[in-house]
Amino acid sequence: MSLMDPLANALNHVSNCEGVGKNVAYLKPASKLIGRVLKVMQDQGYIGNFEYIEDGKAGVYKVDLIGQINKCGAVKPRYAVKYQEFEKFEKRYLPAKGFGLLIVSTPKGLMTHDEARTAGVGGRLISYVY
């Protein structure tokens, strides 16, 4: 059986593990996109450390959870958004203004919607976390 969206599966697994109070989540299969999303989440203080573990197949990410995530998930379809339009999607995916973040894939790499707005670049919405 193949996964249709490994990123959505990984974020759903993180959200479920946070919900039941686990301290560690193991995400597989691992990919560069999942690693970059985890890095943004770590930089913003939603997760602790994470590490890549080679298992001879697709690899595994071990993520230390710190109890900061209420909900996280992938945005589907991946909307193309101009930096002036982030507020519309904040209202759709986040519970309140200034609470949580949208992760955006831009030509300058993955970043939060606030960083993209400050840099003046748009991109595709990848996920949300709050």
Swiss-Prot record:
One of its GO terms (cellular component) is ribosome. The keyword RNA-binding applies. The keyword NADP does not apply. Signal peptide: none annotated. PROSITE patterns: RIBOSOMAL_S8. It comes from the Archaea. One of its GO terms (biological process) is translation. One of its GO terms (molecular function) is structural constituent of ribosome. Keywords: Ribonucleoprotein, Ribosomal protein, RNA-binding, rRNA-binding. Belongs to the universal ribosomal protein uS8 family. NCBIfam families: PRK04034.1 (NF003115). Part of the 30S ribosomal subunit. One of the primary rRNA binding proteins, it binds directly to 16S rRNA central domain where it helps coordinate assembly of the platform of the 30S subunit. This is Small ribosomal subunit protein uS8. The gene is rps8.
